[in-house]
């Protein structure tokens, strides 16, 4: 008699590790910027540029980009801003890591703050949480029935067991991976200042974030919708002594190509924020 089997392809977690990373550096104020009297706010973003696996460890390379809003002692205009970066390269212990397999790294910026060393130097400190894992593809043989030797020789598809042999079967639900990919979804839009707001000369500080982010499968694609929240602090034209701010929301709706998918499938989608930029135009 023979055990009939069916092969199932699956991904199993090979290894994983969590750690906290502290980034800290002293940053000089650029020569073109006035002295710092008081720090108002700092905003940081993490950009992971490369992840690679080595034997029993993972290497993460990236940088912390920050924007600092501060108060100066200049009478002409007291509010100023400066930007900077802190590069990092970290080795994470990852037992049983395979150098030939891809490493997946998830990260969160838990804290980012700045302190004043002197009027021309600040200390920037950030805490970054990292979760790294590696998955390996396996092929499993699942038993589907027992057939007699005569049935095997006759190439009969009936899985009825031979006399004297009992079998117990249970249904098992499985899914098949249709697509596994990475892609970029770019949001590029523009908005006008409302009436009553002066024109923008220079952007001092801005914040961009998403709200109500939702994904839905469509035929051969993934639909992404949400709102982009915008806050801008700027100096107006012909009046650099004063400051103006502007807040608004911009809806976005777009489709990322994903060949072979449709709305009846089950999706496992992860969205990671990328680079942000904002500029004023006349």
Language-model segments: residues:
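Viral structural modules
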Residues: 1-282
């Amino acid at each position: 008699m023979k055990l009939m089997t069916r092969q199932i392809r699956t991904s199993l977690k090979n290894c994983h590790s969590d750690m906290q990373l502290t980034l800290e550096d002293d940053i000089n104020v650029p020569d073109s910027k006035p002295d710092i009297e008081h720090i108002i706010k700092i905003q940081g973003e993490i950009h992971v540029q490369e992840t690679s696996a080595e034997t029993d460890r993972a290497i993460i390379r990236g940088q912390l980009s920050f924007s600092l809003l501060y108060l100066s002692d200049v009478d002409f205009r007291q509010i100023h801003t400066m930007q900077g970066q802190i590069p990092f390269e970290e080795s994470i212990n990852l037992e049983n890591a395979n150098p030939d397999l891809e490493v997946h790294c998830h990260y969160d910026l838990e804290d980012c703050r700045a302190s004043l060393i002197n009027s021309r130097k600040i200390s920037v400190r950030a805490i970054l949480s990292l979760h790294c894992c590696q998955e390996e593809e396996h092929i499993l043989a699942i038993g589907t029935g027992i057939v007699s030797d005569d049935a095997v020789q006759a190439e009969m598809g009936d899985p009825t067991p031979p006399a004297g042999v009992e079998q117990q079967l249970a249904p098992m639900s499985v899914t098949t991976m249709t697509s596994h990919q990475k892609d970029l979804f770019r949001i590029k839009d523009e908005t006008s200042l409302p009436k009553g707001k002066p024109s923008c000369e220079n952007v001092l500080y801005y914040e961009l974030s998403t709200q109500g982010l939702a994904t839905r499968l469509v035929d051969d694609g993934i639909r992404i919708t949400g709102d982009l929240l915008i806050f801008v602090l700027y100096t107006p034209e012909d009046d650099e002594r004063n400051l103006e701010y502007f807040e608004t929301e911009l809806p976005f709706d777009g489709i990322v190509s994903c060949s072979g998918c449709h709305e009846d499938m089950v999706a496992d989608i992860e969205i990671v924020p990328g680079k942000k930029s904002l500029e004023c135009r006349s």
